[in-house]
Curated annotation (Swiss-Prot):
It is found in: Cytoplasm. The keyword Amino-acid biosynthesis applies. PANTHER family: N-ACETYLGLUTAMATE SYNTHASE (PTHR23342), N-ACETYLGLUTAMATE SYNTHASE, MITOCHONDRIAL (PTHR23342:SF0). GO terms for biological process: arginine biosynthetic process via ornithine; L-arginine biosynthetic process. Catalyzes the ATP-dependent phosphorylation of N-acetyl-L-glutamate. This is Acetylglutamate kinase. Pathway: Amino-acid biosynthesis; L-arginine biosynthesis; N(2)-acetyl-L-ornithine from L-glutamate: step 2/4. GO terms for cellular component: cytoplasm. The lineage of its organism: Bacteria, Pseudomonadati, Pseudomonadota, Gammaproteobacteria, Aeromonadales. Substrate binds at G45, G46, R67, N159. Gene3D superfamilies: Acetylglutamate kinase-like. One of its GO terms (molecular function) is acetylglutamate kinase activity. Its main location: cytoplasm. It catalyses: N-acetyl-L-glutamate + ATP = N-acetyl-L-glutamyl 5-phosphate + ADP.
Length: 259
């Protein structure tokens, strides 16, 4: 594998939008066929978790953009993310003729996960681990599809924010990182796209409340990744396949987050 590995984090309501998911995987197929570049997908699936918990009569809250995960709920959340969401992604890959392997953060020790904050319950902090398994899978021509469920050294299932998980995986692989969500990138106070975002500007926008909640988590993860990887991280949308192909080919799309 001579070409730089690319980690793509898929988020937002994508998993509930079958048409968009189909278009995305068609774009990824074109990219893989044309570029022959190693690719890793990392996904969450918060909308599936919300639907499942609601169906079970359970409540779900967030604190600073992170889902509070009571330990009694983690079996359901792990089932939604590592089970349903992961296999839905796998199904699209297979239907698009992309050979893929479904994984979680614990497989092969890819990421080291510990409890982030007791107040959040079974929510994990994610650090880069051993990339050997994923590197081997990539070397065999498969697409790793990784859910954001981790396991601690004590064997406890943990729900990890998918942006943070993708960052840790990119660090472990020394890869480029693209974060795809519902929005076209980072937006300013007037709803306009910010093409380039540095740490000083990002902190200022967060202090003013322009960037908050889930987007703040995303920006912090992107800043951390940009600093660790020593290169910009892109935050863009999955909604426009033509723009996505341009982005994957190195074009300027979305927001470039740099230190």
């Amino acid at each position: 594998m001579d070409k730089q590995t690319l980690v793509i984090k898929l988020g937002g309501a994508l998993i509930e939008n079958d048409e968009a998911l189909t278009a995305l995987f068609a774009t990824l197929k074109t990219f893989l066929d044309e570029q022959h570049r190693p690719l890793v997908l990392v996904h969450g699936g918060g909308c599936l978790v919300d639907d499942l918990l609601k169906g079970l009569g359970l409540t779900s809250t967030k604190k600073n953009g992170l889902r509070v995960t009571p330990f009694e709920q983690i079996p359901f959340i792990a089932g939604a993310l590592a089970g349903t969401a992961n296999k839905m992604m796998m199904a699209k890959a297979i239907a698009t003729d992309i050979p893929a392997v479904g994984l979680c953060l614990a497989d092969g020790g890819l990421c080291q996960v510990t409890q982030l904050d007791p107040a959040l319950g079974a929510v994990g902090d994610c650090q880069p681990g051993n990339p050997a398994l994923v590197t081997g899978i990539l070397g065999q021509g498969f697409l790793p599809v990784v859910s954001s469920i981790g396991i601690t050294a004590q064997g406890q299932l943990m729900n990890v924010n998918a942006d943070q998980a993708a960052t840790a995986i990119a660090e472990a692989l020394g890869a480029d990182l693209v974060m795809l969500s519902d929005v076209s990138g980072i937006l300013d106070g007037k709803g306009k796209l910010v093409p380039q975002l540095d740490k000083v500007t990002a902190l200022d926008l967060m202090e003013k409340g322009v960037i908050s909640d889930g987007m703040a988590v995303k920006v912090k993860a992107a800043l951390h990744a940009a600093e660790t990887l020593g290169k910009p991280v892109c935050v863009a949308s999955w909604r426009y396949p033509d723009q996505l192909l341009k982005l994957l080919a190195g074009g300027a799309v979305g927001t470039q987050v740099a230190i």
